[in-house]
Swiss-Prot record:
Belongs to the universal ribosomal protein uL4 family. InterPro entries: Ribosomal_uL4, Ribosomal_uL4-like, Ribosomal_uL4_dom_sf. GO terms for molecular function: rRNA binding; structural constituent of ribosome. One of the primary rRNA binding proteins, this protein initially binds near the 5'-end of the 23S rRNA. It is important during the early stages of 50S assembly. It makes multiple contacts with different domains of the 23S rRNA in the assembled 50S subunit and ribosome. Forms part of the polypeptide exit tunnel. Gene3D superfamilies: 3.40.1370.10. Disulfide bonds: none annotated. It comes from Rhodopirellula baltica (strain DSM 10527 / NCIMB 13988 / SH1). Keywords: Ribonucleoprotein, Ribosomal protein, RNA-binding, rRNA-binding. GO terms for biological process: translation. GO terms for cellular component: ribonucleoprotein complex; ribosome. This is Large ribosomal subunit protein uL4. The gene is rplD. Part of the 50S ribosomal subunit. Residues 67-87 are annotated as: Disordered. PANTHER family: 50S RIBOSOMAL PROTEIN L4 (PTHR10746), LARGE RIBOSOMAL SUBUNIT PROTEIN UL4M (PTHR10746:SF6).
């Protein structure tokens, strides 16, 4: 059981949020978190790298100079890999790095990541985060009041809040995601995670995207 202080937009504590971390995930598997994070990172790779073999670069195959009598080392084509502008000995071709782990494992990893951040005291809870119109300066001031200025922060909202998204996207190191789109990579990358109370309620009652049936049995099998 964890008790998290609930703060308002001015940084003042207005209550306590009680959450049972055992209900989120009964344990934290570093190996599973690593596997899922590496999967997300691999899926983000473009894989557009391309190098040319000596048979693909332009240039003649003619011997550069005669074999003997010049005093130089023996040399053949200009397109060999030891020459400037020549081909590459072991080429890299475009490829698709993406792969997929089981859905259940991915969802369990998301909940494990949330529990890990709670256990490490890296989650901040705000009672309400609402603006009348997109305003970057207001979000920046709220983050400063919460002690999150100049800190990489993930803001987790209950739903798709375009006002908060547009207000926070221009701040370096700040990302805004609805709670249903959270995953192990987005949760573990920033130094702090700012949850609205409503978003944390969805994590608590299991109505966010990372919830699964038979949590304890699934984690035991992971």
């Amino acid at each position: 059981m964890a008790n998290l202080p609930i703060l308002d937009a001015s940084g003042k504590e207005v209550g306590q949020y009680e959450i049972d971390t055992e209900q989120i995930a009964n344990r934290v598997s570093k190996q599973l978190l690593h596997d899922v994070v590496v999967m997300y990172q691999a899926n983000k790779r473009q894989g557009s790298h391309n190098t040319r073999t000596r048979g693909q670069v332009s240039g003649t195959n003619k011997k550069m100079y005669r074999q003997k009598g010049t005093g130089n080392a023996r040399a053949g084509s200009k397109r060999t890999n030891v020459r400037r502008g020549g081909g590459v000995a072991r080429t890299v071709k475009p490829r698709d790095y993406s792969y997929r782990l089981p859905k259940k494992a991915i969802k369990i990893a998301t909940r494990m990541a949330i529990r890990s951040r709670i256990d490490d005291g890296e989650i901040v809870v705000i009672n309400e985060l609402k603006l009348d119109a997109p305003k970057t300066s207001q979000i920046a001031q709220i983050l400063k009041n919460l002690g999150l200025a100049n800190t990489t922060t993930l803001i987790a909202t209950a739903g798709d809040d375009q006002i908060i998204y547009k207000s926070g996207r221009n701040i370096s190191g700040v990302t805004v995601e609805p709670v249903r789109q959270l995953n192990a990579l987005t949760l573990l990358t920033p130094k702090r995670v700012l949850f609205t109370q409503e978003a944390l309620d969805r994590v608590k009652d299991g109505t966010f995207a990372g919830s699964t049936q038979n949590t304890n049995e699934a984690e035991a099998a992971a």
